[in-house]
Amino acid sequence: MSLLVIGINHTSASVDLREKVAFSPEKLTKALDELKNSDAIQSGVILSTCNRTEIYCEVKHGISSGYVINWLAEFHHVALEILMPSIYIHEEQAAVKHLMRVSCGLDSLVLGEPQILGQVKKAFADAREHNAVEGTIEKLFQQDFSVAKRVRTETNIGGNAVSVAYAACTLARQIFESLSDSTVLLVGAGETIELVAKHLDDSGCKRLIVANRTRERAMGLAEQFNAEVISLPEIPEHLPKADIIISSTASPLPIIGKGMVESALKLRKHQPMLFVDIAVPRDIEGEVAELNDAYLYSVDDLQSIIDHNIEQRKIEAIQAEAIVSEESAEFMTWIRSRQAVNSIRQYRENSEAMRIELLQKSMQALASGQNPEKVLAELSNKLTNKLIHAPTLAMQQAAKNGETEKLTVIRTTIGLDN
């Protein structure tokens, strides 16, 4: 048996090719059934996300990566010559290390992103549900989850915001001690604002107001995060209630002006307000920054935070890579020890079968009245010849091929150099 990973990802393949070899839920069920019933694959897990498709498997003796690649191409009806240039292959410890790097976010488009671990866990759960995993692969994934947890615990690789949405929320958390006591006004209802809302919700934000041009789009967010919905013209009325304002619309002109904020601050008795403008062009007039107790950050300010945090993640990644190298080596040690146990068991079983076979023949000879001394002598000779046959052939072959090291190992193994 040997461990194998074959796959494509955002660095090796185009979006078009990644889409062609992605596994929908229906395709995944069929694929896992095929893996489970394959004569060549002992156990396997399929990881399929928007950025990667990878097959982690334990293949039987004599099976190469080409078998799995051919299967992938045939399954998705993609020509091999189109698929091959984008395929990467990892075997044995390299396969173990690759899985651990993936789960720790070290191989992600966004370094250190945590979502991939959940996707790996789901891929493993799907494979288990279809009885496609066992033995070494099952142990590998269980160990992988422990390694990912260790990396998150011992490093800060996921602790620095590297997306605009997350950076905006991080900034809010840094300025306001508790988001659970703050009111947040979100202006817009697009994908970025939806991500912001999710991060705020995860951070314990309880009071959320969503302002949008169309109420229908905002209602989806409101239902998801228990938010209040207002229209854009209603912003001046609700602005004094907001401690944090995060805006991202496609408006060609600013939505929130200096005068509007000035009025809100008076009604708030100049309690501080944080404005985070992540729209291009800007949603909030730059002059707002001139007001006391109004703190305005633009998308450029956030980008400088993100750039700094990316560098911090790269530093943390060095320690994470060291942990992965250590853990992958330890896992291979476990595999080798398991292989040794299996080899020892097989050797003992073969020897026992040989002993029983010769003993039965000797018992039959004794029962037929043959001389006991002669029977015992023949038994000992045959047993000796059978036991030394394989080592003798191996030493002869090693000597013939000039394999000095192999010859030394055999001599040590059979006790000649003890």
From Swiss-Prot:
**Binding-site positions, NADP(+):** G188, A189, G190, E191, T192, I193
Transmembrane region(s): none
The record lists the catalysed reaction(s) as: (S)-4-amino-5-oxopentanoate + tRNA(Glu) + NADP(+) = L-glutamyl-tRNA(Glu) + NADPH + H(+)
| Keyword NADP (UniProt) | yes
- Give the GO terms filed under biological process for this record: protoporphyrinogen IX biosynthetic process from glutamate
Enzyme Commission number(s) from the entry: 1.2.1.70
Entry keywords, A to Z: NADP, Oxidoreductase, Porphyrin biosynthesis
- Residues involved in substrate binding: T49, C50, N51, R52, S108, E113, P114, Q115, Q119
> Pathway it belongs to?
Porphyrin-containing compound metabolism; protoporphyrin-IX biosynthesis; 5-aminolevulinate from L-glutamyl-tRNA(Glu): step 1/2
Looking up InterPro entries in the UniProt record yields: 4pyrrol_synth_GluRdtase, 4pyrrol_synth_GluRdtase_dimer, 4pyrrol_synth_GluRdtase_N, GluRdtase_CS, GluRdtase_dimer_dom_sf, GluRdtase_N_sf, NAD(P)-bd_dom_sf, Shikm_DH/Glu-tRNA_Rdtase
Tell me the active site. Answer: C50 (nucleophile)
The organism's superkingdom is given as Bacteria
| CDD domains with a match to the protein in the record | NAD_bind_Glutamyl_tRNA_reduct (cd05213)
Listed as disulfide-bonded, the cysteine pairs are none
What does the annotation say about its assembly with partners?
Homodimer.
Also noted in the record is: During catalysis, the active site Cys acts as a nucleophile attacking the alpha-carbonyl group of tRNA-bound glutamate with the formation of a thioester intermediate between enzyme and glutamate, and the concomitant release of tRNA(Glu). The thioester intermediate is finally reduced by direct hydride transfer from NADPH, to form the product GSA.
The similarity annotation says: Belongs to the glutamyl-tRNA reductase family.
Description of its domains: Possesses an unusual extended V-shaped dimeric structure with each monomer consisting of three distinct domains arranged along a curved 'spinal' alpha-helix. The N-terminal catalytic domain specifically recognizes the glutamate moiety of the substrate. The second domain is the NADPH-binding domain, and the third C-terminal domain is responsible for dimerization.
The record ties this protein, via NCBIfam families, to: hemA
Q: What does this protein do?
A: Catalyzes the NADPH-dependent reduction of glutamyl-tRNA(Glu) to glutamate 1-semialdehyde (GSA).
What's the name of the protein?
Answer: Glutamyl-tRNA reductase
Tell me which species this is from.
Answer: Aliivibrio fischeri (strain MJ11)
